[in-house]
Amino acid sequence: MNLNIQKKRVEPFLKWAGGKSQLLEQFKSLFPKEGSYRRYIEPFIGGGAVFFYLEPKEAIISDLNKDLIEAYKIVKSHPKELISLLKKYEKQHSKEFYLKIRDEYNANKLDKINKAAHLIYLNKTCFNGLYRVNSKGEFNVPFGQHKKFTVNKEGILAASKILKKTKIEHT
């Protein structure tokens, strides 16, 4: 009996400019076959659509954006604490709360777990999921009119599991 069960793919926990999520089916035939490579190396991880799609057994991921890389490290090492913070944000979600979180993020006085939670919240609730900073290095994307913010607990836990086998570097 052939049930043809497909494994559910892990979705990126962030939206990022240049993301490949929409193109994965088109690119599928171009990806290396599982087992045909020893290590996956991604120098510009962004949202990580290809990385999460391939779920490599061994990987090195990197990016120039330090906050992005720190968020990946937090998802890898502290997913439950991160989810707990994001659940609190879920309950407080509003334009005013978004602006408060954005100000705190820009003040650059947060510990790594709070900084990652702020980045994920801002990314999921800002206009078009953009990451943009001004000349002072401050995140300045406006609120995206999202009526609701929902934490993807299962997605973060699944991403954490894949990231456990991954070396994460800031370049």
Where is each model-derived feature located?
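SAM-dependent nucleic-acid methyltransferase catalytic core
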Residues: N2-L24, S29-E34, H78-T171
